[in-house]
Swiss-Prot record:
Name of this protein: Protein VraX
């Protein structure tokens, strides 16, 4: 899956998800992106992440 921040609606970040199969995922973000948001994003990929090696 590819996930990227699409826009903010009523103060809530909205994401667009493109389904693909990848061996690695890179998430890039700026200083406005907090740690809780990364966990929300990764939870969307839970099934895919079960088979991946994570590093940060």
């Amino acid at each position: 899956m590819i996930i990227y921040k699409q826009n903010i609606e009523n103060g809530i970040p909205m994401y667009e998800i493109i389904t693909k199969t990848f061996k690695t995922i890179t998430v890039k973000f700026d200083e406005t992106f907090n740690k809780n948001e990364i966990y929300k994003l990764l939870s969307l990929l839970e099934n895919d992440l079960d088979n991946m090696k994570l590093g940060y």
